[in-house]
Amino acid sequence: MTSVKFKLPPKGFIARRFIEVAVLVLGRGIEIRGDELVITDCMNFSMSLNNVINNVDKGMNIFLTGNDRKYIIGRMARILGLDVSGESMPIHLLQALSKVIEKSVKDVCITKDLQEEISLLNILKVNFYEYGRAYLSKPKDKFLMIDKLPIFLQLLGILGILVSTVGIIKNQGIRYYVLPPEGIPLKLPPGELEEMLKHFNTAYKILKNYYDMPRSILITRLAMELINTGCEDDRIIAELVGIQEGGKRATRATVVSVEPISTEGLIQIIRTSIIDEKNVKELATKLGLLIDVGLQSLREGLVSGDKTGTIVLRLTSDLLMYARTKSLDSLYSAISILERSKEYIKRDPQEFKYLINTLKERGTEPNLWLSELIRLMSMLIRAYEASLH
């Protein structure tokens, strides 16, 4: 089989970003070369596609307008051999695509009808520069638009939507997606694609649970996870993109926020302050566990009365402040919060039942666990003080 090539949508359109993330997750048999998508090995691509489809949320839907459902999805379904009497779920389209490619793997791989350009799904028309938004400037010569894309590319875009969705705020009609920062570079050095996928998976794992949490909690939890995966420096690891897809006035999908997600110096502070890698990983693991318990507390605290989440919010705020300002007061405050937590647990354990129960399930005494966390955190203070002499 000769390689199959498709011209990608221009940078600045969400369609490009969703296709890129689909290619990143698929990994084998398909790649991006500059502004082209290339299927290099149909057999490997077919196996990768089947594997990814088997692991996505089967019940997830995507934003569709009435025209999308009636004309575009219906057209895709007919070409893929699906029953068009009912509405096809995204997963049904992708499963059908996988079967078509399996049958054509030794021949053309992507059949001619899948290469046909048809009107674009509304969600794939979204761009990052409309209305003068700051994150990408509007083209000076003319307003760039795309109206059509090949069916195959649109199906890859749908796959990208499914694998990058991290959450929905229903009362605002906003869906959040995690995407690699700035997309996939036109010239990616060898070996970096694997690292990009590793970081994307980490960002997805954390943002899936924390996308709606205060920034200090999200950033600290992400930094701890990255430390435990071996990351040695701070970086912008992903973009959290919010798209308005619902609400009373929403007639089409529109980008409403693009937030770079970075570790803001936390990794560097911990790694330069603590020499022993074992202590580094232990601190990251303990803070990660505490934040996970805090997440449960914040989500259910009003009902349960648990206050672990309040402690975690204050602690992570102090840590992030220290990372940004190097103010020792913030670090002292963070450790003081942990010291007082030991007293709070003794005085009223019911208010910290989530933390107590989690630790006891692991065979750990809460006060001893907190004392060890305080010891590890104190290493940051000692390192700071040593740097002054």
Where are these predicted regions, by residue range?
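Long, contiguous all-alpha helical interaction modules
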Residues: 1-99, 236-389
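N-terminal functional modules and adjacent low-complexity/disordered segments of proteins
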Residues: 123-126, 139, 174, 347-350, ...
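Domain-exit/linker segments immediately C-terminal to small folded modules
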Residues: 136, 140-289
